[in-house]
């Protein structure tokens, strides 16, 4: 280990920054956040330093480097664009046994600055030992996505509860299970963020007083249309916290690779006209796992409330008294159209968009007359097998045969394939495509040649 990671208490302690530019400003923000009594020494200062000085937040010393400013310091940072001057600052600090950071010169520094994730009082520091700051930043960004924004407030609140929790729960195991429940409780985190004292008290009392083997909960999470990068931040956090993940075939392998490693995975994939697992059985799986006290994520492709039968699953849980929540996802219409260069609405071509299921069951006739109207975009989910019928009905009710259409297969994935043509060709085009596919019909499809960015990548 080349560097010892430590967290310094700098509140009301003298610190010095030599330099008055943008880099020095970034370092100054960190020291001010830590409560340091800060002096900045430079020949000139960018406006932000002047504003801080006018607000009484720091002291500016304009002029050449003054070594005597180090005499009362606990910590120093050399942040100029003059390597020789930075070296002088480092040597002067070393002579006084003061830790000194030298920007972009780790070998000349007695300490280095890590990438920081601030969820105070929870702090996470990531460092590559100065060898690869970009790598450290990338790792920080990944960790940022895993830590809820309000986690720090929950941590502070947990400190206030420690005494009561120790009295309430006799064993270490019971206390650990309580804290695990508290730290993943979204309602408590949101209540703390909003300073909603009534909700904070109610949620806390519920968590403390309910039996530790109490029923679990189910979180309905939209996985998005395929590209793992389109999974929402909250969706990622939920699958990282799950005990059980119940997922369907539209959830990509890349997204499943993000699931917590020791979580149980239950595949309930479905295909049009054939259900690998009946919907009622899926409902019962969710109910059964939650009743065991587990945190269950029902992971669905796209958005769970758009042709995802999410409402049916939640009704079952609601009737059984199982707590649940919903994390929306990017629906296939949004993802596939964006990755195909097809805007769903456009000032000149479409003032509305309709999302329609292509499962045209007997006795469930669609309002074809309204669907055939101009100035709108139609998006058919699961419509591949009914493409010929869709073509026939729309033309029958007055839609022009030359209306542009597109079919998007495996939308947003690296294997995405798009084929376009006119409405008179729709049935024929569909025979060239495989599921999962989305059908887009409307004048906006004509913009694809100009706006198609994804195929160029």
UniProtKB/Swiss-Prot annotation:
Reaction equation(s) it catalyzes: uroporphyrinogen III + 2 S-adenosyl-L-methionine = precorrin-2 + 2 S-adenosyl-L-homocysteine + H(+); precorrin-2 + NAD(+) = sirohydrochlorin + NADH + 2 H(+); siroheme + 2 H(+) = sirohydrochlorin + Fe(2+)
Entry's EC annotation: 2.1.1.107, 1.3.1.76, 4.99.1.4
Residue runs in coiled coils: none
Keywords, alphabetical: Cobalamin biosynthesis, Lyase, Methyltransferase, Multifunctional enzyme, NAD, Oxidoreductase, Phosphoprotein, Porphyrin biosynthesis, S-adenosyl-L-methionine, Transferase
Active-site positions on this chain: 248, 270
Region described as Uroporphyrinogen-III C-methyltransferase: 216-457
GO molecular function: NAD binding; precorrin-2 dehydrogenase activity; sirohydrochlorin ferrochelatase activity; uroporphyrin-III C-methyltransferase activity
This protein's record includes keyword Transferase: yes
SUPFAM superfamilies named among the record's database cross-references: NAD(P)-binding Rossmann-fold domains (SSF51735), Siroheme synthase middle domains-like (SSF75615), Tetrapyrrole methylase (SSF53790)
Classification via HAMAP family: Siroheme_synth
Reported function: Then it catalyzes the NAD-dependent ring dehydrogenation of precorrin-2 to yield sirohydrochlorin. Finally, it catalyzes the ferrochelation of sirohydrochlorin to yield siroheme.
Name of the protein described by the UniProt record: Siroheme synthase
Species lineage: Bacteria, Pseudomonadati, Pseudomonadota, Gammaproteobacteria, Enterobacterales
């Amino acid at each position: 280990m080349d560097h010892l990671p430590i967290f310094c208490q700098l509140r009301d302690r003298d610190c010095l920054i030599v330099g008055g530019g943008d880099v020095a400003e970034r370092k100054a923000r960190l020291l001010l956040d830590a409560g340091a009594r800060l002096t900045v020494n430079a020949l000139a200062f960018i406006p932000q330093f002047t504003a801080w000085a006018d607000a009484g937040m720091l002291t500016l010393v304009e002029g050449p480097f003054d070594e005597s400013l180090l005499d009362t310091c606990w910590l120093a940072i050399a942040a100029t664009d003059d390597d020789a001057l930075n070296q002088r600052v480092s040597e002067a600090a070393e002579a006084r046994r003061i830790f000194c950071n030298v920007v972009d010169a780790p070998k000349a520094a007695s300490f280095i600055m890590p990438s920081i994730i601030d969820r105070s009082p929870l702090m996470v520091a990531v460092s590559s030992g100065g060898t690869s700051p970009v790598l450290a930043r990338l790792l920080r960004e990944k960790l940022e996505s895993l830590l809820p924004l309000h986690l720090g407030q929950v941590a502070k609140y947990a400190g206030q509860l420690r005494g009561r929790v120790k009295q309430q729960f006799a064993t270490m195991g019971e206390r650990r299970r309580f804290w695990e429940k508290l730290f993943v409780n979204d309602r408590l985190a949101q209540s703390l963020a909003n300073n909603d004292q009534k909700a904070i008290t109610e949620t806390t009392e519920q968590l403390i007083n309910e039996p530790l083997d109490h029923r679990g909960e189910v979180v309905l999470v939209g996985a998005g249309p395929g590209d793992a990068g389109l999974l929402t931040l909250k969706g990622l956090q939920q699958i990282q916290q799950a005990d059980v993940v119940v997922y369907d075939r539209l959830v990509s392998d890349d997204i499943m690779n993000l699931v917590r490693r020791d979580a149980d995975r239950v595949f309930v994939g479905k295909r049009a006209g054939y259900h690998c697992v009946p919907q009622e059985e899926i409902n019962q799986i969710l109910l059964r796992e939650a009743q065991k006290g587990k945190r269950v994520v029902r992971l669905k492709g796209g958005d769970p409330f758009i042709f995802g039968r999410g409402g049916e699953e939640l009704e079952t849980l609601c009737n059984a008294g199982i707590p649940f929540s919903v994390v929306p996802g990017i629906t296939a219409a949004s993802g596939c159209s964006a990755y195909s260069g097809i805007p769903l609405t456009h000032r000149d071509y479409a003032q509305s968009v309709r999302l329609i299921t292509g499962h045209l069951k007997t006795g469930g006739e669609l309002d074809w007359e309204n669907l055939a109207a101009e100035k709108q975009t139609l998006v058919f989910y699961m419509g591949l097998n009914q493409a010929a019928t869709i073509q026939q009905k729309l033309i029958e009710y007055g839609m022009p045969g030359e209306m542009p259409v597109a079919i998007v297969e495996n939308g947003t994935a690296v294997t995405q394939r798009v084929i376009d043509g006119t409405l008179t060709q729709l049935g024929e085009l569909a025979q060239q495509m495989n599921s999962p596919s989305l059908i887009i019909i409307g004048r906006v499809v004509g913009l694809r040649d100009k706006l198609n960015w994804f195929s160029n990548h």
